[in-house]
Amino acid sequence: MIEKEDLLKVARTEMPFGRYRGVSLIDLPEEYLLWFVDRGFPTGKLGELMQLTLEIKINGLEGLVKPLKNDN
């Protein structure tokens, strides 16, 4: 079960490193996330959120998450 808190984090957490530093996880290109499938996601919560982001994108559900970026 996906937790609402995790969806909010996917929408509001920015990538802390690399080419897409400062970009919200939900706005990362799917190809970039797929690169981590081959190379390994970061450990910890960031890696979990990145994997969740990829699942959201693969299933075409970005439209449900993007509005949460600005929802307070």
Please identify what each model-predicted range represents.
Residues 1-72:
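DEDD superfamily 3′-5′ metal-dependent exonuclease/proofreading module
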